């Protein structure tokens, strides 16, 4: 029986990469393939987490955190101890600590490298990591991107296109939480609700989405889920623009509450400005509930591929509040157009982004890789 290890990032889950690792681990286990995650613990708890009969999260101790990388010598030791148990190690990049652990592990089996994003922000540290990153690219038997755009455009993958492929990230459809959705809508009677979800960090471009509200009629409200280092700065912007009654930072949301906000909104908006936003699972989550999507055309990113322009919604230029406002009003102000994009969003989800389809493709790829010995 094939056994796979997902290697990288952190636990408990905070970002999209960790979420993908968990979806892979649970999805494989549901099909009867034992699968584990090996991660650095965020909170100091190193007890194993049992996800299901065939799926576990193995956690190691964090020594320090440098430039969003968890330093964990224990990760190296742990991987060396367990490496022979796995037919495939699926490494999730960017995570320098995972690359270091694999380098020193002595693992001889198949390696799949999942290229979620180039390293963009920590360019100084990239100088030191680049030789190891190059080794990781050479060591990989197969390299996955999340979209064809990112695989083709990444400067680091130009010379290895022969062993690259792409695997769109799929999720289970969100449930329609009627009572919770009704409660949220009741808080904003007669309003059109714009929802956005993601950490309050610079690459999300929330300042442009907030500014877009000054170009929209009073009937529009903007709700932004999650927390982050820019919370105070964004709250100050909201107050300076006189938008306290129309823009709300919701803070962190539990899963069910988050699902309810997706269902309650009229349109989901992603205002990201950098290719750090390589995919945006939140777009897929919104589409699963038939929410029209407005996203940005980030150069070299896969975001505008995920949100098919004039199918599941509209894509607009980055850093352009007026373009965001125009797209929002165009969809929300025309019931027939809203219905068109709502149906298109759900159809795109069904055709491309279901979890079942993703896991089927993943198992098929793993099997082919092992058969190519």
What do the predicted segments below correspond to?
Residues 91-98:
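Short His-centered aromatic/hydrophobic patch
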Residues 233-253:
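Nucleotide-activated donor-binding/catalytic signature segment of Leloir-type glycosyltransferases, i.e.
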Residues 288, 292-297:
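Short hydrophobic beta-strand element within catalytic cores of glycosyltransferases
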Residues 263-278, 291:
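Acidic donor-binding loop of glycosyltransferase active sites
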Residues 5, 183-213, 223:
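Conserved donor-binding/catalytic core segment of Leloir-type glycosyltransferases
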Residues 246, 323, 330, 337-352, ...:
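A short, well-ordered alpha-helix in the C-terminal region of glycosyltransferases
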Residues 39, 133-179:
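Donor nucleotide-sugar binding/catalytic pocket of nucleotide-sugar-dependent glycosyltransferases
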């Amino acid at each position: 029986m094939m056994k796979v290890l997902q290697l990288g990032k952190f636990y408990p889950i905070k970002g999209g990469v960790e979420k993908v690792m968990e979806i892979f681990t649970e999805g494989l286990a549901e099909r009867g393939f034992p699968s584990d995650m090996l991660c650095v613990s965020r909170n100091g708890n190193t007890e194993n987490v049992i996800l299901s009969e065939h799926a576990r999260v193995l956690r190691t101790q964090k020594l320090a955190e440098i430039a969003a990388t968890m330093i964990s010598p224990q990760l190296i030791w742990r991987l060396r101890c367990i490496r022979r148990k796995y037919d495939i190690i699926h490494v999730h990049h960017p995570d320098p600590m995972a690359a270091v652990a694999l380098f020193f592990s002595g693992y001889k089996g198949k390696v799949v490298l999942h290229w979620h994003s180039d390293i963009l922000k920590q360019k100084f540290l990239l100088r030191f990591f680049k030789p190891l990153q190059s080794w990781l690219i050479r060591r990989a038997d197969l390299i996955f991107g999340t979209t064809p755009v990112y695989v083709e455009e990444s400067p680091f993958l130009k010379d290895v296109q022969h062993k690259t492929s792409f695997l769109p990230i799929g999720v289970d459809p969100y449930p329609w939480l009627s009572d919770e959705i009704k409660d949220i809508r009741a808080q904003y009677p007669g309003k059109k609700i714009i929802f956005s979800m993601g950490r309050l960090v610079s690459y999300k471009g929330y300042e442009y989405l907030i500014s877009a509200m000054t170009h929209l009629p009073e009937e529009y409200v903007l709700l932004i889920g999650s927390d982050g280092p820019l919370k105070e700065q964004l709250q100050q912007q909201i107050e300076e623009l006189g938008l306290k009654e129309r823009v709300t930072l919701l803070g962190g949301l539990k899963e069910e509450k988050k699902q309810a906000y997706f269902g309650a909104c009229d349109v989901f908006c992603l205002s990201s400005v950098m290719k750090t936003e390589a995919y945006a699972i939140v777009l897929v989550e919104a589409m699963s509930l038939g929410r029209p999507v407005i996203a940005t055309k980030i150069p070299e990113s896969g975001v505008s591929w995920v949100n098919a322009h004039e199918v599941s919604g509209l894509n607009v230029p980055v850093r352009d509040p007026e373009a965001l406002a125009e797209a929002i009003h165009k969809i929300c102000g025309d019931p027939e157009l809203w219905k068109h994009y709502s149906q298109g969003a759900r159809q795109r989800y069904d055709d491309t982004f279901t979890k079942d389809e993703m896991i089927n493709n993943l198992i098929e790829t793993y099997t082919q890789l092992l058969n190519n010995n």
